[in-house]
């Protein structure tokens, strides 16, 4: 099964959770913060403007993005947890 986001929605795979604190303490699953970074897997066609034009998204598949801790909706696809969020919920694109 594959998912194709609609309009200005973006499908993101969250980075792996940190299992150790900065001081080297192993964190249990409930205490580990969910990362606010991830890889864009797929994007919608774009945002429909008031005059009916379609504005393409600024992010593309393969981009690494930073988003808010509570951004998006979690979906499970073939056993993998992914996030679907609006492009507006993305705070930045990580550039190397």
Curated annotation (Swiss-Prot):
It is found in: Cytoplasm. SUPFAM superfamilies: GroES-like. Gene3D superfamilies: GroES chaperonin. It comes from the Bacteria. One of its GO terms (biological process) is chaperone cofactor-dependent protein refolding. GO terms for cellular component: cytoplasm. Keywords: Chaperone, Cytoplasm. Together with the chaperonin GroEL, plays an essential role in assisting protein folding. The GroEL-GroES system forms a nano-cage that allows encapsulation of the non-native substrate proteins and provides a physical environment optimized to promote and accelerate protein folding. GroES binds to the apical surface of the GroEL ring, thereby capping the opening of the GroEL channel. NCBIfam families: PRK00364.1-1, PRK00364.1-2, PRK00364.2-2, PRK00364.2-4. Belongs to the GroES chaperonin family. Heptamer of 7 subunits arranged in a ring. Interacts with the chaperonin GroEL. HAMAP family: CH10 (MF_00580). This is Co-chaperonin GroES. The lineage of its organism: Bacteria, Pseudomonadati, Pseudomonadota, Gammaproteobacteria, Oceanospirillales. The gene is groES.
């Amino acid at each position: 099964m594959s998912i194709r986001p609609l309009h200005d929605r973006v499908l993101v795979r969250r980075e792996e959770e940190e299992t150790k604190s900065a001081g080297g303490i192993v964190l249990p699953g409930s205490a580990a913060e969910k990362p606010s970074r991830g890889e864009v897997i797929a994007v919608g066609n774009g945002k429909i403007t008031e005059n009916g034009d379609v504005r393409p998204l600024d992010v593309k598949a393969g981009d690494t993005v930073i988003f808010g801790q509570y951004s998006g909706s979690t979906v499970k696809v073939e056993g993998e947890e992914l996030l679907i969020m609006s492009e507006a919920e993305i705070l930045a694109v990580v550039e190397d």
